[in-house]
Amino acid sequence: MSSPEKVEPQRAILESFANPNPQRDYEIDMHCPEFTCLCPKTGQPDFADFRITYVADEKCIELKSLKIYMWSFRDRGAFHEAVTNQIMDDLIAVCDPRYMQVQGAFYVRGGITTTITVEHHKERSTEA
């Protein structure tokens, strides 16, 4: 099990492809309902439903690579907050979107559900 302080990224798994319509803003919504990682305190599995919504710039996320990337967390210990932010950071590094929201809705553990939502807005140039 990985150290709870750091989620080991599998960024190299992620792939992108050229956005077929970069001149237009359009929303891409991906749903990953079978996410699993390990609780860094107990080693027990944590299950989550991830929703990734973004507006692509020049690149889009390739779906098969996203699936394999999300599966790569199955044997990793990670706090909910850390893993959600790591997923956001890795996706931004791969596709540099105009906008992205990553939401991880973790299933009940000890009578408590946790939902972590992170957003990214790309800074646009103000030059004319």
From Swiss-Prot:
Major subcellular location class: cytoplasm
Pfam families, alphabetized: QueF
Catalytic activity: 7-aminomethyl-7-carbaguanine + 2 NADP(+) = 7-cyano-7-deazaguanine + 2 NADPH + 3 H(+)
Chain sites annotated for binding substrate: I61, E62, L63, H80, E81
Keywords (A to Z) from UniProt: Cytoplasm, NADP, Oxidoreductase, Queuosine biosynthesis
Pathway: tRNA modification; tRNA-queuosine biosynthesis
Locations listed in the record: Cytoplasm
InterPro entries: GTP-CH-I_C/QueF, NADPH_dep_7-cyano-7-deazaG_red, QueF, QueF_type1
Any one GO biological process: queuosine biosynthetic process
Enzyme Commission identifier(s): 1.7.1.13
Residues of the active site: C39, D46
CC terms in the record's Gene Ontology section: cytoplasm
HAMAP family in UniProt: QueF_type1
UniProt name for this protein: NADPH-dependent 7-cyano-7-deazaguanine reductase
Source organism per UniProt: Magnetococcus marinus (strain ATCC BAA-1437 / JCM 17883 / MC-1)
Species lineage: Bacteria, Pseudomonadati, Pseudomonadota, Alphaproteobacteria, Magnetococcales
